[in-house]
């Protein structure tokens, strides 16, 4: 919508852009409530009861005064779900409604949709990329495979004929090519990738992070978890030098204390990064190959012509992620899954010492999720490669994970 068109990557962390006219969760939901009141034959008491239930279901009351641009990706999805269900639609089409939600919220949503389906209140169509996300109340499945629409079958028929995923999707040849890549920053010798001492972050009256101590050693592979709104993306924004509050915190990155003369580019040159916010911020319809190449210089667009060697690296990573043949296809003409794979290729292309993957498997099908996990496992086998990965699905974590930090929400 209009919010997405004016959104940029660091906007969530820049509070100086928030004023009394900035839309909040409460104003957005009030608009949905007012629209629902115009529905013919709808009783106000019934609507009020539905609103109260949705607010309880998705824990929306604590978010009502929060500006929409400050929402985490999971909180934003909960807002959109509440808004949509509040308008009492007769036909509901939901595109991957479970991604970005923590385990408790996913289960609550399954229960809610199951009750709606059982009552026959509306026609429900779910677009899902993960077979495991299909709720048991679904009656029929239509599979789209390589742009071919398969015949409609019952859920039982679909599950009975599913082919098991092979143990390995990444070819041995490609894995060896990744392991044998030349190192970009031969002078890199940081002992610690990140050290945070008693870090606290507040937005208005709400505490996001409180007295957090965290050390990420060189070569470690971390899983970062927590409920929606627990501060995972905020923490990553401090490490990626996207959050202005980092200068007021005791943070050392790559053995360099923040605010001691280093530029954000000194930090970013070592980091490859993918997140839901980054995906949302990419609205430029430029060829996929150019987007991958922009990762070489940490820019949104491509402003410096890459060398032949750099372009070869871009094509290599596009091929790794199954994007060969899509180099000239512009970003907005790709599917959301293909877009995510392009952004992953962009994150890996400069051979970063730290790879930060915030829910990188959003919208990917079963095969591509397996592929990405194998690419991650292979890449971090190399010397001086550190990983921080966020996901709400434990089975999405690659096997290389050897450390875990769980954040707690401070309401």
Language-model features: locations:
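Conserved ABC ATPase "signature" region
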Residues: 46-63, 293, 308-326
């Amino acid at each position: 919508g209009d919010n997405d068109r004016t959104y940029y990557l660091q906007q969530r962390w820049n509070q100086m852009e928030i004023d009394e006219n900035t839309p909040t969760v409460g104003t957005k939901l009030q608009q949905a409530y007012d629209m629902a009141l115009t529905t013919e034959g709808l009783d106000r008491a019934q609507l009020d009861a539905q609103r109260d239930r949705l607010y309880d279901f998705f824990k929306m009351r604590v978010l009502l005064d929060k500006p929409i641009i400050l929402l985490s990706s999971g909180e934003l999805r909960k807002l959109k779900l509440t808004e949509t269900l509040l308008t009492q639609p007769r036909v509901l089409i939901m595109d991957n409604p479970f991604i970005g939600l923590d385990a408790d919220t996913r289960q609550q949503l399954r229960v809610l949709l199951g009750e709606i389906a059982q009552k026959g209140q509306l026609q429900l169509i779910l677009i899902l990329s993960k077979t495991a996300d299909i709720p048991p109340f679904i009656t029929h499945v239509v599979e789209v495979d390589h742009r071919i629409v398969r015949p409609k079958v019952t859920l039982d028929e679909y599950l009975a004929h599913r082919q098991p995923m092979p143990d390995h999707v990444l070819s041995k040849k490609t894995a060896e090519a990744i392991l044998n890549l030349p190192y970009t920053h031969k002078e890199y010798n940081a002992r610690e990738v990140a050290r945070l001492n008693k870090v606290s972050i507040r937005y208005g009256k709400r505490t996001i992070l409180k007295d957090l101590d965290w050390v990420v050693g060189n070569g470690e592979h971390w899983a970062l978890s927590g409920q929606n709104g627990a501060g995972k993306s905020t923490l990553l924004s401090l490490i990626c030098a996207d959050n202005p509050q980092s200068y007021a915190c005791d943070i050392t990155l790559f053995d360099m204390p923040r605010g001691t003369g280093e530029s954000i580019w000194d930090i970013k040159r070592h980091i490859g990064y993918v997140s839901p916010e980054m995906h949302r911020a990419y609205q430029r319809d430029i060829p996929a190959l150019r987007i991958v190449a922009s990762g070489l210089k940490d820019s949104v667009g491509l402003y410096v012509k890459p060398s032949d060697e750099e372009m070869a690296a871009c094509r290599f990573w596009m091929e790794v992620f199954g994007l060969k043949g899509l180099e000239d296809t512009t970003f907005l003409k790709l599917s959301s899954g293909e877009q995510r794979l392009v952004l992953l290729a962009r994150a890996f292309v400069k051979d970063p010492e730290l790879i930060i993957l915030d829910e990188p498997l959003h919208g990917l099908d079963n095969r591509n999720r397996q592929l990405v996990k194998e690419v991650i496992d292979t890449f971090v086998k190399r010397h001086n490669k550190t990983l921080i990965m966020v996901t709400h699905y434990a089975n999405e974590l690659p096997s290389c994970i050897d450390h875990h930090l769980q954040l707690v929400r401070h309401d």
